């Protein structure tokens, strides 16, 4: 009876992670004993000793190993056990008397499990497949010679399975490689002509789940001589010392999981031999040998295959590195150029995107983005900047590693499906908690050939009222169209991204130190300059007043005695003194913006505006100016400075009016964390090329004959806004009026603003 897995609410994950190594069962072709050192007392034994040793299991338990073996063998074993490395005695030949003078010879293998118990495994010694060392050496040498003749990794893998099949004489030999997601695929196969090919087929992670893969790392070679044989139970089931099932992680006789045996049965496999290919302590792949019928593999042949597997995989690793070498060297060259470009630019981002090769070339991506603070610099084909804001926030909340990469971003971040055409793949490196460098790859629709439906890796049988998980029975070709995926990121590309991260962090840190030093020097210089301007303005007032007084006295007393030229000269002197007094007053006002502590308090903007309009009432009346405003908020600001700001901006709008009467409007808009104010007029306008220059001290766009003034008004406005941690700018076209914008943060950091200090550099926050 078949039932659906989901409808029964079965926890498939827990079943896949069952502790196989604690099953307490072994395969029937050998005997396993659990010994307690140092006396080698037999604590547990497999329940098949009568058929193999001719001794009942009950007669062995609680005895010592010396009761089974002669003193010579015990002495040899004790010597090997004391050496510290059990490989020196594995395997060792053991003779056990069965009846009378009838002895049986066994291959004995020792190991200590995680609990510290000594495990002894006995297999009948079969000599017909014994491979002497020199024969094996020549076999390995011949295989390697064949392998070294191949041109690429794919051909190399095909030679591997051919050579292993020659050695083992199995009906089918496959090389199975794992993907990063745990799925696997057959990349090489050698088989009987009558068998259906598995080459190129993919298999889901559930076929070889994580616990099984961990055991393949612990046991680099596994043999199942008869997949139909009944497993043998250990007796007693629990170790009498630990009161737990014995740990058989490293046992060569350990029985396979029932689910795996049924899986082999469904594939028509009678025996299997598996050689693990391990790289950097991870399971890279397997050489899987299948036979249609039962097939025993001697210990010597297994060790030969294990050694051959290690030699072969060393060559595989070398081939992989060789095939990656040219690409890796090219990426290293690109990386060194990018570091050089970044070092030469004031802004390191320019070094990544303005030159060739660029950031895209480092990972063979179609798009990239450098997101620093609230700004993203884009290159190539990327999602929109507003989409990247949310993506970076997701990375910040969910990723803690130094690098994040995926070839199916929509699977982990569903919002990315909207821009799958440019960003189905993502490689991201954090420069800090809020700053990222991102690379993107577009969707590549693929057809994957599976060995059976990957969406139905298990079936459920319900017999006698019991629900039992069992593997699928169908391994027919099942084609799947895979969407929302990109080409995978290669290991060398990920490493290159990590190396670039280190370089960027070093450059940013160095630039931050340089900027901090420059800021310190500039702050000191500005402080000295402001102090000088303040003192100089003060000290110049008195002599200038004397000059003004004497010139006016000269004009009053001798006006009738002087000719027209002399009177004109006196007029010029009076005007010059007046201009100088205005200039000194403006310089003094400019210096006071920073030198006098601003009294930050909740200020009604409308009241500050009213005071400014009151100071300008005469000019407003003379020009017929019409001034309107939106409802204005209350902000944390210096009321006097806010009044001066409006007064300067409105005075400018009146001064630089067109032929029409001035129309001036003050607007206010609440943004996320600041207020945006605007002062719009219908005056003569400003050429956009001068939009920055007008805020520089003493800068004028017109002569004094055209418009009076010192060029200080907008510079003072800029200083006031900077003290409030805001921004000020102008948008205008010549002849079309101008709109001045400025911002003031919502709320306030009163102490920070009062002290005139900048917030801590948040580059690495």
From Swiss-Prot:
PROSITE patterns: HIS_KIN, PHYTOCHROME_2
The EC number(s) this enzyme carries: 2.7.13.3
Keyword Ion transport: no
Residues binding a tetrapyrrole, per UniProt: 259
Biological process terms in GO annotation: detection of visible light; regulation of DNA-templated transcription
PTM-bearing positions, type Phosphohistidine: 538
UniProt xrefs under InterPro entries: GAF, GAF-like_dom_sf, HATPase_C_sf, His_kinase_dom, HisK_dim/P_dom, HisK_dim/P_sf, PAS-like_dom_sf, PAS_2
Alphabetically ordered keywords of this record: ATP-binding, Chromophore, Kinase, Nucleotide-binding, Phosphoprotein, Photoreceptor protein, Receptor, Sensory transduction, Transcription, Transcription regulation, Transferase
Domain GAF span(s) in chain numbering: 152-320
One function term, GO molecular function aspect: phosphorelay sensor kinase activity
UniProt PTM comment: Contains one covalently linked tetrapyrrole chromophore.
Residue numbers spanned by region Chromophore binding domain: 20-510
Domain Histidine kinase positions: 535-748
Catalysed reaction equations from the record: ATP + protein L-histidine = ADP + protein N-phospho-L-histidine
Function of the molecule: Photoreceptor which exists in two forms that are reversibly interconvertible by light: the R form that absorbs maximally in the red region of the spectrum and the FR form that absorbs maximally in the far-red region.
Family: In the N-terminal section; belongs to the phytochrome family.
Matching PANTHER family: PAC DOMAIN-CONTAINING PROTEIN, PHYTOCHROME-LIKE PROTEIN CPH1
Designated name of the protein: Cyanobacterial phytochrome A
Gene transcribed to yield this protein: aphA
């Amino acid at each position: 009876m078949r039932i659906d897995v989901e409808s029964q609410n079965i926890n498939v994950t827990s079943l896949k992670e069952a502790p196989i190594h604690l099953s307490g069962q072994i395969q029937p072709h050998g005997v396993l004993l659990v010994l307690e050192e140092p006396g080698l007392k037999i604590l547990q034994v497999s329940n098949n000793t009568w058929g193999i040793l001719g001794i009942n299991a009950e007669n062995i338990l609680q005895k010592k190993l010396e009761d089974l073996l002669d003193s010579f063998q015990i002495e040899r074993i004790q010597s090997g056990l004391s050496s510290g490395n059990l490989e020196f005695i594995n395997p060792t030949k053991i003779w056990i008397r069965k009846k009378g003078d009838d002895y049986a010879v066994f291959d004995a293998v020792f190991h200590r499990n995680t609990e510290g118990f000594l495990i002894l495994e006995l297999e009948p010694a079969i000599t017909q497949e014994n491979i002497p060392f020199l024969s094996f050496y020549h076999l390995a040498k011949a295989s390697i010679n064949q392998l070294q003749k191949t041109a690429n990794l794919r051909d190399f893998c095909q030679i591997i399975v051919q050579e292993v099949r020659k050695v083992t004489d199995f009906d089918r030999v496959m090389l199975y490689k794992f993907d990063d997601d745990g799925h696997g695929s057959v990349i090489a196969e050698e088989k009987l002509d009558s068998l259906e090919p598995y080459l190129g087929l993919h298999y889901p992670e559930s076929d070889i789940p994580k616990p099984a893969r961990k055991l393949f790392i612990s046991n680099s070679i596994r043999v199942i001589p008869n997949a139909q044989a009944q497993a043998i139970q250990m007796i007693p089931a629990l170790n009498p010392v630990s009161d737990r099932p014995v740990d058989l992680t490293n046992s060569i006789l350990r029985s396979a999981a029932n689910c795996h045996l049924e899986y082999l049965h469904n594939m028509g496999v009678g025996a299997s031999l598996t050689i693990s290919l391990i790289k950097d302590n991870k399971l890279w792949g397997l050489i899987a040998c299948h036979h249609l019928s039962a097939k025993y593999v001697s210990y010597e042949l297994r060790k030969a295959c294990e050694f051959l597997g290690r030699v072969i995989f060393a060559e595989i690793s070398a081939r992989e590195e060789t095939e990656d070498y040219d690409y890796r060297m090219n990426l290293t060259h690109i990386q060194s150029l990018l570091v050089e470009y970044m070092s030469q630019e004031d802004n390191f981002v320019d070094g990544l995107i303005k030159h060739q090769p660029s950031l895209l070339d480092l990972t063979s991506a179609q798009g990239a983005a450098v997101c620093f603070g609230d700004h993203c610099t884009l290159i190539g084909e990327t999602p929109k900047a507003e989409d990247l804001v949310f993506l970076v926030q997701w990375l910040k909340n969910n990723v803690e590693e130094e690098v994040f990469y995926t070839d199916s971003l929509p699977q982990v971040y569903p919002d990315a499906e909207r821009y799958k055409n440019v960003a189905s793949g993502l490689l991201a490196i954090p420069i800090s908690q809020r700053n990222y460098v991102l690379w993107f790859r577009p969707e590549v629709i693929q057809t994957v050939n599976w060995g059976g439906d990957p969406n139905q890796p298990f079936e459920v049988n319900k017999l006698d009222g019991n629900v039992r998980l069992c593997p699928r029975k169908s391994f027919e070709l099942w084609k799947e169209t895979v969407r929302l995926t990109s080409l995978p990121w290669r290991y060398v590309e990920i490493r290159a991204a990590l190396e670039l991260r280190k370089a960027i962090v070093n450059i940013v840190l160095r630039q931050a130190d340089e900027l901090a030093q420059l800021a310190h020097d500039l702050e000191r210089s500005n402080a000295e300059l402001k102090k000088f301007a303040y003192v100089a303005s003060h000290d110049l007032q008195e002599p200038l007043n004397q000059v003004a007084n004497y010139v006016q006295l000269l004009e009053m007393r001798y006006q009738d005695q002087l000719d027209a030229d002399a009177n004109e000269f006196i007029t010029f002197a009076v005007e010059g003194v007046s201009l100088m007094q205005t200039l000194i007053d403006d310089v003094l006002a400019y210096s006071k913006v920073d030198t006098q502590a601003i009294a930050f308090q909740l200020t009604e903007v409308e009241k500050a505006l009213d005071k400014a309009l009151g100071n300008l009432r005469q000019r407003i009346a003379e020009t017929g100016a019409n001034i309107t405003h939106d409802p204005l908020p209350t902000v944390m600001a210096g009321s006097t400075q806010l009044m001066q700001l409006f007064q300067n901006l409105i005075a400018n709008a009146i001064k630089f009016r067109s032929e029409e009467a001035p129309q001036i409007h003050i607007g206010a808009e609440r943004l996320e964390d600041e207020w945006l104010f605007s002062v719009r007029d219908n005056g003569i306008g400003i050429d956009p090329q001068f939009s920055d220059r007008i805020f520089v001290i003493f800068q004028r766009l017109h002569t004094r004959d055209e418009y009076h003034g010192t060029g200080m008004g907008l510079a003072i406005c800029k200083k006031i806004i900077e003290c409030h941690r805001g921004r000020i700018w102008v948008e205008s076209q010549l002849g079309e009026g101008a709109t001045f914008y400025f911002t003031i943060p919502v709320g306030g950091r009163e102490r920070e603003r009062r002290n005139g200090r900048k917030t801590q550099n948040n580059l690495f926050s």
